[in-house]
């Protein structure tokens, strides 16, 4: 999963290099092997979150940073954490059903996961879902 996320980030950085060249990524990703179904859904969610941060979060941020983390607990629950140090999002903006939010919702449902957005020195996203037997 770590190498997949690195490739994904490199592709997104190349696409948006003209918008924010100071952007730094912090990865805290356990060695996790996921099936293509899980990896694709997480990749799509990650892409939407990073794209949103790059486009909207860092206008007033001198040293923009995005943190991405994955961990699995003893109950086989994968937790995906995403945060940026941008300007955050007003609660009412999180309720809007723009395309990015719909995609995040669709892929989270595909994973049968529970997710939440919140502000904590920027936008934060947390997704929990159970890795089914034989599909990790």
PLM features per residue range, with description:
Residues 1-15, 21, 71:
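Short beta-to-alpha transition helix within the HATPase_c
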Residues 17-50, 54-65:
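Conserved short strand/loop->alpha-helix "switch" segment adjacent to the catalytic nucleotide/phosphoryl-transfer site
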Residues 63-76:
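Short beta-strand/loop element within the Bergerat-fold HATPase_c
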Residues 76-101:
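Glycine-rich/acidic phosphate-handling loop/turn and adjacent ATP-lid/helix
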Residues 81, 123-133:
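Short C-terminal beta-strand
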Residues 87, 112, 130-135:
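Two-component histidine kinase transmitter core
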Residues 111-119:
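Glycine-rich ATP-binding loops of the HATPase_c
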């Amino acid at each position: 999963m770590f190498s997949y996320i690195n490739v994904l980030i490199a592709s997104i950085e190349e696409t948006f290099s003209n918008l924010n060249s100071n952007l730094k990524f912090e990865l805290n990703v356990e060695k996790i092997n996921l099936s293509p179904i899980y990896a694709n859904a997480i990749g799509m969610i990650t892409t939407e979150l990073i794209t949103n941060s790059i486009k909207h979060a860092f206008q007033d941020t001198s040293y923009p940073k995005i943190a991405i983390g994955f961990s699995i607990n003893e109950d086989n629950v994968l937790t995906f954490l995403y945060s940026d140090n941008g300007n955050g999002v007003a609660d009412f903006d999180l309720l809007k059903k723009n395309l990015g939010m719909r995609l995040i919702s669709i892929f989270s449902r595909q994973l049968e996961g529970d997710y939440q957005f919140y502000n904590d020195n920027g936008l934060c996203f947390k997704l929990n879902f159970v890795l089914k037997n034989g599909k990790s």
